[in-house]
Amino acid sequence: MGFPLPAELIARSRAVGEPRWAPGGNFVAWVEGFGPRADVVVAPADGSTPPAVVTAEVGAASIGSYGGGVWCWVGSDHLAVVDADGRLVLVPSGGGPVRVLSDEGRAGAPASSPDGAAIAFLLERDDACDVAVVPVVPLVSGSSRAMAPVRVSHADYAWDPAWAPDGSALAWHEWDLTAMSWDESRIVVAGPDGSRAAVVAGGSGISVGQPRFSPGGGALAYVSDATGWWNVWVADAAGHGAAPLVTEEFEHAEPAWAPGQRSFAWSPDGAAIARCRNEGGFASLVVTARSGGSRALAKGWHHGLDWGGDGIVAVRSGARTAPAVTVTDPGMGDPGMGDRRVLACGAPAGFRAAGLVEPEPVSWPGLDGGTVHGLWFRPERSARGAGTLPPLLVDIHGGPTGQAAVQWKPWHQYFVTRGWAVLAPDPRGSTGHGRAYTRALAGRWGSLDVEDCAAGLARIGPAGWGDPERVAVTGSSAGGLTALLLAAHHGERIRAVVSRYAVTDLLGLAETTHRLESRYLDRIVGELPRDADRYRDRSPVTHAGAIRIPTLVLQGDADRVVPPAQAVALVDAIRAAGGTVEHHVYAGEGHGFAREETILDMYARTEAFLRKWVLDA
């Protein structure tokens, strides 16, 4: 039997992401983050020496909470990095002075031209997010500044530029603010100066992303949900003759909340593509030859794929596996599986998988008869003793386009190893189950998701998922809205609710959130001012007086997505109605908690709260 997962191990874990082979395949670099600090590190591919931090002078942008697209190689001896202040800088891979390439706005998703003479990147300002190109010119008179970047895109949002191998073209992913990228978006191919721009994929009702030219330059691959599922498509370099690499009812991408997603990679010879296949929350690394035929190499989620050197480098994780930078050899090992080595692990020393649990897929009928999916974690022992049903924690993901995926989720394992069962629902609106499942939430956020989770609550006893008399609900961000509405409308089935940086006021969110989500609610709630009453009715703050179960509200004071005032308004309304509520604000934390001391407090505070109101009540 395993031991409870210590909060200290969770709090001391590092984030790892965006691994890339250096040209030539002798080195690998990736991003490591601890707390609010992130850096790019470089290591020999054979692991002969420890990774070396190359951004100590300037830091690197975060890869979590909407962060991503942090860096790229520029030749084999430099890196273009988005530093901690959002500038684009040039960093020598072996150490040396840092050069500023652009300090206009905030940079992201850099991509070097094949000759290293220019960097394409996204340049975000208050009113625009464009693909821009900046030349990498020699220093003049000791200046550390380069030339001004030139905008080449013209949509509301443009991300993830990619160069053709001969430097003659750029491709990128763009969309307009009347939609989110997973609603509808476009792949554009243009000259490096933006000339001859042509939309080659996507458009009305179709979501696309991750454009990537083949190493030889004869083909362009990207993800598209034109079949109803995010599959990898391949066209010629001009975007003509597109067809899916395979047509599967599995997703091969996640919603693009941030730039830099790499869920597939070309082989060095362009003859095959490696892809992470989402199998209803579980996942596999699969290689498919362009001539036909697929081979599963490894189980588990693989993010940030890059194929070079002696294999496929990625960040691998699973329910019992903390994220690690791994290299999988696609040509060796047992049939169906590739050999794998670990270059870096996010978990600190002392991490053990003993006692951690693999979830089981579950489903139940929604109140309207539709099928709702989820994952159920069964603990090795019940927190209430042998022979008893375990208390159940229902944890609702954010988004609401998130997914209860079989990835490393320490929140779930923390409670499972303490004798709680965990149900992680995927109410409709979640991704991972096809486009129709996601788009079923159109106009119904705050209603259908609540109904789907309520139907799950009704199944707890009959399905034996846990003790129906000892149920707690937790949720973060969009999932916090669903959790709080469940507490208001179905509180008779719940003992306590925990909200982490939750949306509580939809009208307020529409007025104050950041630009990326400024029109998000148009599709999943309704258009303003026409549907203002719907916004009010779907807001937890409107129903605060009906929340009669104990409530814990956790919030960061630096949250740019959900302003802290939303938590304050909810807490004040619950207290005014005579409800029981605890409220804690974490200094310096944004939309998602990162600091070691915050994480330690969050787990301790939540565990004490649930013990008081669920286990000991």
Language model features with spans:
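Beta-strand-rich domains and repeat architectures in extracellular enzymes and scaffolds
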Residues: P4-V41, G69-V70
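A short beta-strand motif characteristic of beta-propeller blades
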Residues: L5-I10, A52-V54, V58-A61, P97-S102, ...
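Non-catalytic accessory segments flanking enzyme active sites
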Residues: G17-R20, A38-D39, G108, L122-L123, ...
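Blade-terminus and WD-like Trp-Asp/Gly-His loop motifs, strongest in beta-propeller folds
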Residues: P19-F27, W71-D77, P110-A118, P161-A169, ...
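A flexible loop/linker signature enriched in serine peptidases of the S9 family
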Residues: V31-V41, G59-S65, A80-V89, S102-A107, ...
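Blade-loop segments of beta-propeller domains
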Residues: P50-S76
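Cap/lid segment of the alpha/beta-hydrolase catalytic domain
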Residues: G346, G350-E469, S476, L509-R515
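Active-site-proximal cap/loop segments of hydrolase catalytic domains
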Residues: P427-A617
